[in-house]
Regions:
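Charged, low-complexity intrinsically disordered terminal segments
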Residues: 1-234
């Protein structure tokens, strides 16, 4: 019961994402590895502020390394002043520890528990090819509408609560009436890793898909950094 729209570029995602954000009625959850000030984020932030004025709950979580180059130090405080619940995940420290490698690489947007975006596209101008860093940047994503969105709502809340002393209940965000899409085909399940878990969920999913493929295997990624295990499976 989930409709999937393939977003073949950052430019495609950008326009659709803004349109869906403007439809939000109850809550908006954003969890991104990279948020960078610029045309893209300024446009998104403008909509978020508009939604705050309408009474929509908005939360923004970004990886702590953004404060080293992408965002001002303490940027989450500015967002809080705007009425947005915000926090950096694993803030960067002036001293090195092994926990500095515990990064939040997710790119998740959930709207009202009914619409979700995920994929490899961050909220920065280079991902939409508004500015150029390494030539034309090719990355992809998907928009989901239907039952599978609950998985992404839960993934966000679980990561949000990692640093919370008082763990809130999830029911009011998960018990959402989701209409069945007319074009839903196949089976969709959201999944995710986190820096604190010992099980490599993402790697296991990829290896299973590779090892059980019988007709074709298509892989698209702007990064190709694979280990010996995956190379052997391929």
């Amino acid at each position: 019961n989930t409709d999937v729209t393939y977003l073949e570029s950052g430019e495609k995602k950008y326009g659709i994402l803004l349109d869906e954000l403007k439809k939000a009625k109850k809550f908006i959850f954003l969890e991104y590895f990279i948020i960078e000030q610029g045309e893209v984020w300024d446009s998104v932030l403008e909509v978020l502020c508009e939604k705050i004025r309408e009474g929509v709950e908005v939360r923004v979580m970004y990886d702590g390394l953004c404060s080293l180059s992408k965002l001002p130090i303490g940027y989450f405080k500015k967002l809080r002043e705007l009425g947005i619940k915000s926090k950096p995940f694993a803030p960067a420290r002036p001293f090195f520890t092994t926990q500095q490698n515990n990064r939040d690489h997710r790119k998740i947007l959930v709207i009202d528990g009914k619409v979700a975006f995920t994929g490899g596209i961050n909220l920065a101008d280079e991902y939409m090819n508004i500015v150029e860093r390494f030539g034309y940047w090719k990355d992809t994503g998907v928009m989901l509408k239907g039952d599978a969105v609950r998985s992404f709502t839960l993934l966000f809340l679980q990561m949000w609560n990692v640093t919370e002393k008082n763990i809130e209940g999830y029911s009011r965000y998960l018990n959402v009436a989701i209409p069945t899409p007319e074009t839903a085909e196949g089976y969709v399940m959201g999944y995710g890793d986190d820096p604190y878990g010992k099980e490599r969920v993402g790697e296991s999913v990829y290896l299973h898909m590779i090892n059980t493929s019988t007709k074709y295997l298509h892989i698209v990624s702007p990064y190709l950094v694979i280990d010996n295990v995956m190379m052997s499976s391929l």
